[in-house]
Curated annotation (Swiss-Prot):
Key words of the record: Ribonucleoprotein, Ribosomal protein
Name by which UniProt lists this protein: Large ribosomal subunit protein uL29
Gene Ontology biological process: translation
Organism: Hamiltonella defensa subsp. Acyrthosiphon pisum (strain 5AT)
KW Ribosomal protein (keyword) present: yes
Ribonucleoprotein in keyword set: yes
Length: 64
């Protein structure tokens, strides 16, 4: 997800996006544990997306 897209979203939308990514991360972990995961690079991508969104949330809360 691009930073420009994320900056346009409200705090509530960003929180929903984090929840969606956390669920996806959990599902990836379950697939990896069952040896069904082929794309291991998704862990890194999702983890970084979550960090990006959390950083934006912190910025938005400090500004408002």
């Amino acid at each position: 997800m691009e930073l420009k897209e994320l900056r346009k979203k409200s705090i509530e939308e960003l929180e929903r996006e984090i929840l969606k990514l956390l669920r996806e991360q959990f599902n990836l972990r379950m697939h990896a544990a069952a040896s069904q995961l082929k794309e291991t690079d998704l862990f890194k991508k999702i983890r970084r997306d979550i960090a990006r969104i959390k950083t934006l949330l912190t910025e938005k809360v400090r500004v408002s």
